[in-house]
Amino acid sequence: MIEPLLCGIVLGLIPVTLAGLFFAAYQQYKRGSQLEL
């Protein structure tokens, strides 16, 4: 049986992690495009 607290933490961390990875990728892409120009 999965504890509600643990389930809530996991469900809360997944979107935050995805948002962090997307933001980091966007920053790297933005920085790379500026260097090329």
Curated annotation (Swiss-Prot):
GO molecular function: electron transporter, transferring electrons within cytochrome b6/f complex of photosystem II activity
Single GO biological process annotation from the record: cytochrome complex assembly
One GO location term (cellular component): plasma membrane-derived thylakoid membrane
Protein's name in the database: Cytochrome b6-f complex subunit 5
Gene: petG
Keywords per UniProt: Electron transport, Membrane, Photosynthesis, Thylakoid, Transmembrane, Transmembrane helix, Transport
InterPro entries named in the record: Cyt_6/f_cplx_su5 (IPR003683), Cyt_6/f_cplx_su5_sf (IPR036099)
Keyword Transport: yes
Membrane-crossing residue ranges in chain numbering: 5-25
Role this protein plays: Component of the cytochrome b6-f complex, which mediates electron transfer between photosystem II (PSII) and photosystem I (PSI), cyclic electron flow around PSI, and state transitions. PetG is required for either the stability or assembly of the cytochrome b6-f complex.
Superkingdom of the source species: Bacteria
Main location: membrane
Subunit details: The 4 large subunits of the cytochrome b6-f complex are cytochrome b6, subunit IV (17 kDa polypeptide, PetD), cytochrome f and the Rieske protein, while the 4 small subunits are PetG, PetL, PetM and PetN. The complex functions as a dimer.
Species classification: Bacteria, Bacillati, Cyanobacteriota, Cyanophyceae, Acaryochloridales
Location in or out of the cell: Cellular thylakoid membrane
Similarity remark: Belongs to the PetG family.
Membrane topology: Single-pass membrane protein
